[in-house]
Amino acid sequence: MPVTDSIADYITRIRNAGNASNKTTDIPYSRLKENLSRLLVEKGYIKSYTVITSEQFPFIRIDLKYTDSGKPAIKEITRVSKPGRRTYEGKDLKKYLGGLGLFILSTSRGVLTDKEAREQGIGGEVLFRIL
């Protein structure tokens, strides 16, 4: 089945794997998804990721992170900018929940968090929010 919104598919696979208490999930590869995974590892929302290219189609294997009580580290992950309605923010981007969560942006300088974008004084497309 073809996917029209690959970022929404990425988010949904992570959310569903966390809700099902799976240790890993596989996601079709793209450079954007690899950069998103790298950012989520840096911010502590997922344990690690591995790009696997031995198959016919490359994919990313994400190792999910859980709290000591067994709950997913990602409490909420929601798509903001959608194919039918793109959402862009300027350099005066507001904090998500007063800084408790993050907005993930696609900018001219790559994939950044809202904090990094504010520090660099740039805006971009708000891909999703995560708590």
Curated annotation (Swiss-Prot):
One of the GO biological process terms: translation
This protein is called what? Answer: Small ribosomal subunit protein uS8
Subunit notes for this chain? Part of the 30S ribosomal subunit. Contacts proteins S5 and S12.
Q: Does the keyword Secreted apply?
A: no
Give the species this sequence originates from.
Answer: Chlorobium phaeobacteroides (strain BS1)
One GO CC term of this entry?
Answer: ribosome
Reply yes or no: does the keyword rRNA-binding apply: yes
GO MF assignments: rRNA binding; structural constituent of ribosome
Any idea what job this protein has? One of the primary rRNA binding proteins, it binds directly to 16S rRNA central domain where it helps coordinate assembly of the platform of the 30S subunit.
Family listed: Belongs to the universal ribosomal protein uS8 family.
Q: What domain of life does the native source organism fall in?
A: Bacteria
The record's annotation in PROSITE patterns points to: RIBOSOMAL_S8
Q: Give the matching PANTHER family.
A: 40S RIBOSOMAL PROTEIN S15A (PTHR11758)
Q: Which UniProt keywords apply?
A: Ribonucleoprotein, Ribosomal protein, RNA-binding, rRNA-binding
